[in-house]
């Protein structure tokens, strides 16, 4: 081995070492017992070095030289490399910034030998990739005072040294660099004129960069290679071939040992880069956008990540040991089969090199195991305390749930035993008197929601008056008087049922919902306070419709708007628009399942011009936050558009869903333009009891042409209320503030309107307005659910048809989403697998867009939206609300007619 190695500066045999990228051990020649540096600087054209005064020594006793020798080093070497200095110091207890070469040298005083301690200049300091793992040959980290626990498997005549990185022949001690980092000089092929030129290469973070010299690192990088997509192999004894598809790089190291250092470092860096790429998430749960976890959880996650990295290091070392062990075994087999004495020298050299490499790698594996064990022992007690705390919290939570269940049952029994039971709905409504005051329920906890009574402008009492008492009701500006006894009254509820002109037969049922039991609390308990759209949920809690289809389902009672087109009075038209806005909540009373979060770029069309007289298009225009744009055109003379962003929070006992964004409705003939927003939905009994949903909050509908207004109030349900559940009340007033109609009903059943004939202040001292009205007229009534609806997710007749397969739709349509289709067919396990695939595909697409934005391919607005541009909608300034909103820019229905969908992305 020593005979075949390049000559060292001292003129002796250069000891060879080959191993992991972190390990640059100076191995003495086995024949002459002189220590050789790990790299020959003359290979790069450096000047000749002085010959160190190293004396030959006698063969030591046959024992492993793994003991720490703490005697002082007495004699310095005569000369050292330029840029370094030679000192003579006693051996410290822990390895510092110098590299030492020491051993048991027979014949020297006290068993010590004069060696050269070389201090590298800062610009020559290079990281040793496996220093943190292979730190005991024997080396300890500067911040650690642990004594190495393993023996170095060195042969007789080998000296034990600290780990450093050879740079032009200089051994430099590093401080715990990462496993996938390395740098040094390599020869790079340039062209046939200049041939191989010396370049400075730096490996880190999965990237290999090179410079002409170290001084260029601060300002000029010649090229950067991404190792995750790079293939590399060895050419000859010192050559390295790198190929990333676009270019091929031919490199040469100074020796086989240095070449092996680089190959091993490249293998580690590539493996880590691929692991990082696979573990990154953006998901319907993007990891890089997740809310910050509590401090304890953050520390635990960091510890687990560190242990995982250590385990990956062990796995990599194990693979390398197996690889080098197999190569060593093959060499030994070849050695046994040799018969010609002339071949023995070359084969013995190969066997010696591989045996040395195997010993070094084995040592690295042992020390990596030691580091992993030490880290695990350090955190074991902390984990035990955390486990005990979690167990105590679980017991406390179970006790709390038991108390809540008892209170729940007690309240239900008390409510059922109340004399007379809950009051039934009537034609007389007293607003604000049924609300529970805080003083009467001071025992409620801090999570209880309190709703104040409406302001005086909307707090009222209605008194029904017979029609014959109405002589000549007053009419405000811009309004007309309606004859309530007329058979053709536009607000006559009997004429509100849509005509059945459907020419296409639609499906009336879907496969029954499978009876899979899954505890919602088991998933949600760790998500308190988080955004609901960022919580990864299995399809078990979904319904086989996307959010785009749920948004389209609001058009089920479109005939209310068709009827409103014919209204000559703007306040009468406002009544129908208000009833339409309330009707969109009627499908939610039993629909506690969560719709699918649409993929970014997903669309849904509803082309029902023949039977419903409208065309509807939805597109998911943003993923975080989830936002959908919607546009509807009706042949009856109205258009509706909106951009809805869903904000949702899990509060422990309930889930709040807050749709953000304005809804626009315009009638082309009259020019009336209505704008309103949605109310807040709340899902109760997340912890215990049956899930139920409620609507709460105020809605103001404004006609921006006439300035008419409608104030709607969704009354939250309360055990202590004597009013009907799910109640909605409202008042329609003109631009002068004069009230014309009173609205009443429930959002899950029906809405009525009563014309006001007289108003006066209340005589009971509460300062509430008393409205004297005519008998109520029916505005809207909910359609009955289809037969067997309880087994079909409580879908309405329209909802059953929304996911029905149709020809000619865009390839991004929700009907073509595979996980949603599998769930509808009852194959939930396959649907969960497919859902994970789609989410990972979406995360990959987002990373690519971010890379393009980083490269400067888009404007500022495009960068803020991670580079995605909607296909059928575009951002515009809404002149009425002053907000930026996505509005339909056209082109979809023309593309459908041409059957040209080449511009659609592949999202499924």
Curated annotation (Swiss-Prot):
It is a peripheral membrane protein. GO terms for cellular component: acrosomal vesicle; apical dendrite; membrane. The modification Phosphoserine is found at residue 284. SUPFAM superfamilies: Oxysterol-binding protein-like, PH domain-like. Its main location: membrane. GO terms for biological process: lipid transport; spermatid development. Residues 179-271 form the PH domain. Keywords: Cytoplasmic vesicle, Differentiation, Lipid transport, Lipid-binding, Membrane, Phosphoprotein, Spermatogenesis, Transport. It is found in: Membrane; Cytoplasmic vesicle, Secretory vesicle, Acrosome. Residues 81-90 have a biased composition (Polar residues). InterPro entries: OSBP_sf, Oxysterol-bd, Oxysterol-bd_CS, PH-like_dom_sf, PH_domain. Expressed in the testis (at protein level). Expressed in postmeiotic germ cells of the testis. It comes from the Eukaryota. Residues 42-112, 279-299, 413-445, 822-843 are annotated as: Disordered. Gene3D superfamilies: 2.40.160.120, Pleckstrin-homology domain (PH domain)/Phosphotyrosine-binding domain (PTB) (2.30.29.30). It holds the Pfam family Oxysterol_BP. GO terms for molecular function: cholesterol binding. Residues 424-437 have a biased composition (Low complexity). Binds 7-ketocholesterol. Acts during spermatid development where its function is required prior to the removal of cytoplasm from the sperm head. Belongs to the OSBP family. PANTHER family: OXYSTEROL-BINDING PROTEIN 2, OXYSTEROL-BINDING PROTEIN-RELATED. Interacts with CCDC159. This is Oxysterol-binding protein 2. It comes from Mus musculus (Mouse). The gene is Osbp2.
């Amino acid at each position: 081995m020593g005979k075949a190695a390049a000559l060292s500066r001292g003129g002796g045999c250069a000891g060879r070492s080959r191993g992991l990228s972190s390990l640059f051990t100076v191995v003495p020649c086995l024949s002459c017992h002189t220590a050789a540096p790990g790299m020959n600087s003359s290979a790069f054209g450096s000047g000749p070095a002085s010959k160190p005064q190293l004396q030959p020594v006698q063969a030591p006793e046959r024992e492993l030289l793994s003991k720490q020798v703490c005697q002082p080093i007495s004699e310095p070497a005569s000369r050292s490399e330029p840029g370094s200095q030679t000192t003579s110091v006693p051996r410290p207890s822990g390895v510092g910034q110098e590299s030492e070469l020491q051993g048991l040298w027979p014949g020297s005083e006290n068993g010590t030998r004069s060696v050269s301690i070389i201090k590298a200049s800062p610009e020559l300091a290079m990281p040793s990739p496996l220093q943190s793992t292979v730190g005991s040959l024997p080396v300890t980290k500067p911040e650690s005072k642990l004594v190495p626990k393993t023996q170095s498997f060195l042969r007789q005549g080998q000296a034990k040294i600290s780990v450093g990185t050879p740079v032009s022949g200089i051994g430099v001690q590093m401080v715990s660099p990462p496993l996938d980092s390395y740098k040094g000089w390599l020869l790079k092929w340039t062209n046939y004129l200049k041939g191989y030129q010396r370049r400075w290469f730096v490996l880190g973070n999965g990237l290999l960069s090179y410079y002409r010299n170290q001084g260029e690192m601060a300002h000029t990088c010649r090229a950067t290679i991404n190792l995750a997509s790079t293939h590399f192999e060895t050419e000859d004894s010192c050559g390295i071939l790198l190929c990333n598809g676009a270019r091929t790089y031919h490199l040469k190291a100074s020796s086989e040992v240095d070449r092996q250092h680089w190959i091993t470092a490249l293998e580690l860096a590539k493996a880590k880069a691929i692991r990082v790429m696979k573990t990154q998430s953006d998901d319907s749960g993007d990891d890089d956008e997740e809310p910050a976890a509590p401090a304890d959880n953050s520390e635990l996650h960091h510890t687990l990540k560190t242990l995982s990295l250590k385990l990956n290091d062990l796995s990599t070392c194990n693979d390398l040991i197996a690889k080098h062990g197999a190569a060593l075994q093959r060499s030994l087999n070849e050695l046994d089969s040799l018969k010609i004495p002339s071949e023995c020298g070359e084969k013995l050299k190969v066997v010696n090199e591989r045996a040395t490499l195997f010993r070094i790698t084995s040592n690295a594996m042992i020390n990596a195991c030691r580091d992993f064990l030490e880290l695990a022992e350090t955190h074991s007690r902390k984990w035990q305390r955390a486990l005990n705390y979690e167990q105590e919290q679980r017991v406390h939570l179970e006790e709390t749930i038991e108390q809540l269940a008892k209170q729940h049952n007690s309240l239900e029994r008390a409510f059922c035993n109340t004399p007379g039971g809950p009051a039934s709905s009537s034609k007389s409504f007293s607003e604000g008197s049924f609300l529970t005051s805080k003083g009467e329920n001071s025992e409620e906890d801090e999570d209880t929601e309190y709703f104040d009574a409406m302001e005086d402008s909307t707090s009222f009492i209605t008194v029904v008056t017979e029609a014959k008492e109405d002589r000549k009701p007053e009419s405000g500006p811009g309004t007309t008087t309606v004859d309530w006894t007329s058979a053709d009254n536009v607000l006559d509820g009997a004429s509100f049922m849509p005509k059945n002109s459907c020419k296409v037969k639609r499906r009336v049922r879907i496969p029954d919902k499978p009876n899979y039991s899954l505890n919602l609390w088991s998933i949600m308990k760790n998500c308190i306070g988080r955004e609901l759209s960022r919580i990864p949920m299995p399809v078990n809690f979904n319904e086989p419709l996307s959010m785009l289809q749920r948004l389209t389902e609001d058009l089920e009672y479109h005939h209310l708007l068709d009827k409103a087109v014919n209204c000559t009075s703007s306040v009468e038209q406002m009544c129908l628009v208000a009833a339409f806005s309330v009707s969109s909540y009627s499908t939610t009373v039993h629909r506690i399942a969560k719709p699918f979060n649409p993929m970014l770029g997903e669309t849904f069309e509803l082309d029902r011009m023949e039977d419903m007289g409208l065309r509807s298009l939805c597109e998911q225009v943003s993923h975080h936050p989830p936002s959908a744009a919607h546009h509807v055109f009706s042949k009856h003379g109205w258009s509706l558009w909106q951009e809805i962003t869903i904000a949702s929070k899990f509060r422990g006992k309930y889930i709040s869903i807050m749709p953000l964004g304005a809804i626009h409705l315009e009638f082309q003939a009259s020019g009336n333009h209505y704008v309103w927003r949605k109310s807040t939905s709340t899902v109760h009994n997340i912890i215990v009891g049956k899930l139920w949903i409620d609507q709460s909050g105020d809605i103001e509908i404004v006609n921006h042409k006439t300035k008419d207004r409608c104030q709607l109030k969704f009354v939250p349900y309360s055990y202590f209320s004597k009013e009907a559940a799910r109640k909605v009340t409202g008042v329609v007033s003109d631009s002068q503030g004069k009230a014309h109609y009173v609205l009443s009903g429930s959002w899950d059943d029906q809405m009525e309107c009563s014309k006001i004939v007289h108003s006066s202040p209340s005589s009971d001292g509460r300062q509430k307005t008393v409205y004297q009205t005519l008998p109520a007229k029916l505005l809207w009534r909910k359609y009955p659910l289809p037969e067997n609806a309880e087994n079909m997710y409580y879908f309405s007749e329209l909802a059953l048809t929304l996911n029905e397969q149709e020809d000619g739709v865009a390839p991004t349509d929700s009907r073509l989403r595979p996980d949603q289709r599998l769930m509808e067919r009852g194959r939930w396990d396959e649907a969960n697998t497919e859902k994970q695939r789609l989410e990972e595909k979406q995360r990959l697409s987002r990373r690519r867009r971010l890379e393009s934005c980083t490269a400067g391919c888009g404007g500022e607005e495009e960068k803020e939206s991670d580079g995605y541009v909607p296909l059928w909608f575009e951002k515009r300034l809404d002149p009425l609300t002053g907000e930026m909103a996505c509005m339909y820019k056209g082109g979809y229905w023309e593309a459908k007619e041409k059957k040209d969908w080449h511009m659609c992305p592949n999202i499924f």
